Design a protein with these regions (language model features):
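Gly/Pro-rich turn-and-neighbor structural signature
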Residues: 3-85
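Aromatic- and glycine-enriched beta-alpha-beta binding-site module
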Residues: 67-124
Length: 124
């Protein structure tokens, strides 16, 4: 079995790569007319993680697109632990993922939203 720390690094790298590729594709659809603006953030509570947000606004096709990647760790609140596999005893977690939200300029085309996550608790 692959070491858990290695799997975390692989997941974090994969989500960074995925974020970059998604941003490139949205910019390609906009034919280079608009570019994403990058913002780096840190988790305020316990300072255990952070992420990168990319925002594209006022394109020809897209009114607004957000492509966010985060990697955080901490402890689930006690009332939430029983709902998460492997978190019941101590509540520790590590998570990484990508979230995408896109709103088109054309009001007849629906918005999209999706995310993908890798969550680690004390139970593998």
């Amino acid at each position: 079995m692959i070491n858990l720390d290695f799997r975390k690094k692989m997941a974090d790298s994969w989500f960074s790569y995925l974020q970059t590729q998604i941003c490139k594709e949205f910019e390609n659809l906009e034919k280079g007319n608009v570019k994403f603006k990058k913002r780096i953030w840190k988790k305020q509570i316990n300072k255990e993680g952070g992420g990168t947000s990319f925002l594209l606004t006022n394109g020809n096709i897209f009114e607004k697109v957000g492509v966010n990647k985060s990697t955080v760790s901490g402890k689930f609140k006690k009332n939430f632990r029983s709902k998460i596999l492997g978190a019941k005893k101590d509540g520790k977690y590590w998570a990484s993922g990508v979230s995408v939200v896109a709103h088109m300029k054309n009001p007849k085309i629906p918005a999209i939203h999706f995310n993908s996550r890798f969550i680690v608790t004390t139970k593998e």
